[in-house]
């Protein structure tokens, strides 16, 4: 069987230890702990109140952020960094039809789903965002990355 290689061309990170590759690796090297009190939702009534949340994150495009769940925002920022690090640009130095995106999530979009469900209960279903479905389906992270990068290959 022929030996196959995996080549890392660029890196991007958004995580509890750093929101870019440099800060992430610096945090790992200095044994920074990304675990702390959960702040993204009320933990009252839950057994767990600690987690590894992303901190100090601001999506650079406020208008686009309204259409994207936080999970997609994290992914897009990490992909932008990885693409810049690699020097790859779909349509310029990479054939977009040979450039695909594979990604996944266990429950990406859950924060939007929870917020919109609460809105429906408290204010009525007419107040639910028409973008809720596109913000909560799990494959939208890969879809949003494809849109961001121009990837049109197998995904």
Task: Give the residues covered by each predicted segment.
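Conserved "HGTGT" condensation-loop signature of ketosynthase/thiolase-family condensing enzymes
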Residues: 1-154
């Amino acid at each position: 069987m022929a030996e196959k290689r995996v080549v890392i061309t660029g890196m991007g990170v958004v995580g509890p230890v750093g929101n870019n590759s440099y800060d992430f690796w610096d945090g790992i090297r200095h044994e920074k702990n990304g675990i702390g009190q959960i702040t993204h939702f009320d933990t009252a009534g839950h057994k767990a109140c600690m987690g590894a949340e992303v901190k100090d994150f601001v999506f650079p495009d406020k208008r686009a952020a309204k259409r994207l769940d936080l999970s997609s925002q994290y992914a897009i920022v990490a992909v932008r960094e990885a693409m810049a690090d690699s020097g790859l640009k779909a349509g310029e130095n990479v054939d977009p039809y040979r450039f695909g995106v594979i990604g996944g999530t266990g429950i990406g979009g859950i924060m939007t789903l929870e917020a919109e469900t609460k809105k429906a209960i408290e204010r009525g279903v007419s107040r639910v965002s028409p973008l809720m479905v596109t913000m909560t389906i799990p494959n939208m992270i890969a879809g949003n990355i494809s849109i961001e990068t121009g990837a049109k290959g197998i995904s």
